[in-house]
Amino acid sequence: MDGFVQEWSNLPRSDNGLHMDQLVGELPTDGGFEPQTRARSNTWPCPRPENFVEPVDELDSTKASNQQLADPQQAMQNANAAKKNSSRRNAWGNLSYADLITHAIGSATDKRLTLSQIYEWMVQNVAYFKDKGDSNSSAGWKNSIRHNLSLHSRFMRVQNEGTGKSSWWMLNPDAKPGKSVRRRAASMETSRYEKRRGRAKKRVEALRQAGAVGLNDATPSPSSSVSEGLDHFPESPLHSGGFQLSPDFRQRASSNASSCGRLSPIRALDLEPDWGYSVDYQNTTMTQAQAQALDQLTGSMADELKLQNDMLQQQGFSAASGLPTQPPPPYQQQQQQQQQQAQQQSQLPQGYTLNGPVSAPGYNTLQPQAQQQQQQQQQQQQQQQQPQCLLHRSLNCGCLHSTRDGLSPNSVTTTMSPAYPNSEPSSDSLNTYSNSILLDAASDNGSLLVQQQQQQQQQQQQQQQQQQQLSSGLEGQCLEALNSEQIDEFNLENFQGGLECNVEELLQQEMIYDGLLDINIPLPAVNTNATNVILTNNSTNNSSSGCNISAGVQLSCSQLQAELQLQQQQQQQQQQQQQQQQQQQQQQQQLLLSNNNNNNNNSLELATQTATRVQYTQPSVVTSPPSWVH
């Protein structure tokens, strides 16, 4: 340890740091240990002089690139040498982990080794791993061996026959020779995948170009993308409907407010004209084909529109119940009605459009006439219908004769007697409703608005009157139906002699049902005539009907309940007493049985004793008196 007393010499520093050769030369060697230039855990190979490449200046590289080699064979040899020298080398040599494992398995007699045996072979046969067999320094290379065993296809794992032992590792005879194939999934970004994706792109572009050329020959229009989309989606309802899109239809994606690529079913009309010109609304009239197409597109919009009451009642609908009061007219009548409406529309002035009405003479006179015709048709239909009884469901009912004068036919037919409750409105009638309502809603004439307001007020008043008449008529009808001759069978006055019942039996039955046991109530002997209850209907006083009950048997509800509770308590006590008595009887029986058993056992013992007893008898000895006795 005396070497450490020496002072360190000041070594010259360079730009690259300290020179290791000078540092090693200055270290003292008498301390008993060799100087180590790097740690033992560093397993990277030492730099070799043949692999060292000197840096080439830019001028030298440019000069060498300008010169041509005289001998091409020499160039090939130099390239091969460079390849050999540039190959990856490990600290133990040129062999990789997979090659070492292959040698280890091949050197075994059975051509198979466990993982621990492979570790032992590495430590024994490879000089680099001799001092790295302990657990601290073997973590890295053992992990590499396990990784190579599971990674390469040349090794196969075989289950060990013994329980609790590690598996065998063997060489795979089916593995390809040469460089081992890695068991790693290939990437999706391969050349084959790129070719396939390129073909799909070309097909899509060809379809788009063909659709654009077929539909737009020379000039592109805003509907080119629409037609292209229809070609890609042949199941679209726009194909089968025969609906042709006008150039005014545009995609919503072209607007700044939306990015959806759907079609807008709204015409691109300039609702807000620019300041430079005025819009001619007369040129924007719609043809009949376009109107039908719009009806087809709207579809279920007719259900959401507020249909007028008079037009609903014309086809058999009622505003009060919401159900059709009569079946829809046959197809021929519907065609006739549609033709009449078309004629009425044709009589309108030509300047009328959906966007706005144009004042013309004669239009105000047509509307009241049409309304009068509709009202006449409604009255005729209501007169044809007949009221129906609610109780008997028959037209020729006797209970309706008295109320038929007080009730109007409108109130009976619109709400009470649905002749065909399961019928539904047809789609053609709804379409005609929607067309007529659109025409009525578009009219802005002042006189029409005044008339409509008056009609609505009148209709509301009529509805209120009808509802009042219905409520009063229904009450009268029900009362008269109850008091009619057809249900006189249920009149209590017709029962002669009254209704008789025995109160004692009734009370006993009720108590039996409540208490679930037969209870005999000690009641005094009462004449049956006095205990009979006679129920008669007092004709003079219709508001109340009484029952004459004898005074001796009148009991209030509270008294009955109290008596029932007492009886139930008595029953419970009796049941408990009975149970106690039964238990006592059982105990007595058990005692008797035990006593009988004891007696039987004693008698058996006595019998056996008498049977086995031996009777000993003394022999009778006759002694004669002595001779000297006389």
Swiss-Prot record:
Transcription factor involved in the regulation of the insulin signaling pathway. Consistently activates both the downstream target Thor\d4EBP and the feedback control target InR. Involved in negative regulation of the cell cycle, modulating cell growth and proliferation. In response to cellular stresses, such as nutrient deprivation or increased levels of reactive oxygen species, foxo is activated and inhibits growth through the action of target genes such as Thor. PROSITE patterns: FORK_HEAD_2, FORK_HEAD_3. It is found in: Cytoplasm; Nucleus. Keywords: Activator, Cell cycle, Cytoplasm, Developmental protein, Differentiation, DNA-binding, Growth regulation, Nucleus, Phosphoprotein, Transcription, Transcription regulation. CDD domains: FH_FOXO (cd20032). One of its GO terms (cellular component) is nucleus. GO terms for molecular function: DNA-binding transcription factor activity; DNA-binding transcription factor activity, RNA polymerase II-specific; RNA polymerase II cis-regulatory region sequence-specific DNA binding. Residues 92-198 bind DNA. The modification Phosphothreonine is found at T43. The modification Phosphoserine is found at S187, S255, S258, S259, S264. Residues 332-350, 367-379 have a biased composition (Low complexity). This is Forkhead box protein O. Residues 1-45, 214-260, 318-379, 403-432 are annotated as: Disordered. Residues 218-227, 408-417, 423-432 have a biased composition (Polar residues). It comes from Drosophila grimshawi (Hawaiian fruit fly). Interacts with melt. One of its GO terms (biological process) is negative regulation of cell growth. The gene is foxo.
